[in-house]
Amino acid sequence: MSVKLEGVELRRIAMPLVSPFRTSFGTQTARDILLLRAVTSDGEGWGECVAMSDPLYSSEYVDATADVLRRFFLPTLAASTEELQRHGAHAVNAVLHKFKGHRMAKAALQMAVLDAELRADGRSWARELGAVHERVPSGVSVGIFDSIPQLLDVVGSYLDAGYVRIKLKIEPGWDVEPVRAVRERFGDDVPLQVDANTAYTLRDARHLAKLDDFDLLLIEQPLEEEDILGHAELARLIKTPVCLDESIVSAQSAAAAISVGACSIINIKPGRVGGYLEAVRIHDVAAAHGLAVWCGGMVETGLGRAANAALAALPGFTLPGDISASDRFYRTDITAPLTISEGYMDVPAGPGLGVSPIPELLDAVTTSSEWITL
């Protein structure tokens, strides 16, 4: 479907978290989020940029994404009307390919244009991506705490809420003992995995092998994102399956990592890889090689959460993702809250994302807004 893009609104919002979320690279108490509203001749669509306030998870950060959109991406789209009219949202990343990196900014822009296109055509996000399930299992990510009793209380509350999989954030000094405590308290039947966010080196292999005793689903991104060969060596030294997150930025990088044995599982985060269309390609590459994938989260609002649920409904997503309910991170979301029932979240079935910002809720958290005519 063709798209005639008239302009894009860049809207910044400030979303306080219900509780601090600590990982190996820092602690978040609020999210500074850039939203994009793409206006076309047929309607509008929404995109959410997952870049954080500081370049800690990746090299991108929210001020930089707004800048690159304003100075480079949007003017380039404005000069590419023929491609957009011919190929719609599928042309966005092709048009922007000459610009190096900035995948989170590209993903947000593609998301907004695709949402507008699908809403105008009456098609759902899930149908466009190739979803085969109407609901998806919901896992939850649990941060680092000051004490093990705190951790156990939080894990227990999430299990009581129905989450079907627990992911523990780990770092040196907070790894084996927290995992041991969770296993001892809640048993071996709870699907459990850990996420290091690049906090270790290959010299820690013997220590990480101690996690083999706990029958974990996986250990996620233990080493630096560029250390593909190190991950391949680690995978040979430990029994716990190695999953890559930060290292996977495209279908090409996924194929390369798979070819050297650096992982047996991939966490697909659409923002990290340049958008949902590239996320589908990574899913296809993994499926062709017999690897499981799952959908990671970036503390999204209901917009990104709905899109992720649709992605997680593709056939190759065989492990529960970080598709948690809105109230996991936000007391009040900007959309109608996404909820879980008996451990599952329904995949939105309406046109486009299937959810929209509620104007009064969006206005209440908006810190700035800029309209750019194309």
Q: What is the meaning of each model-derived region?
A:
Residues R11-I13, I144, I248, G271, ...:
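Short, solvent-exposed coil/turn elements at secondary-structure transition points
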Residues A108, A112, R281, G302-A310:
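Short amphipathic alpha-helical face segments that pack within enzyme cores
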Residues E117-L118, A235, A286, A312:
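A generic structural signal for well-ordered alpha-helical segments
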Residues V299-E342, G350-G352:
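Active-site pocket-lining/capping segments in soluble small-molecule metabolic enzymes
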Residues S2-Q193, N197-L202, R206, K210-D213, ...:
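N-terminal capping/lid subdomain adjacent to the active-site entrance of alpha/beta enzymes
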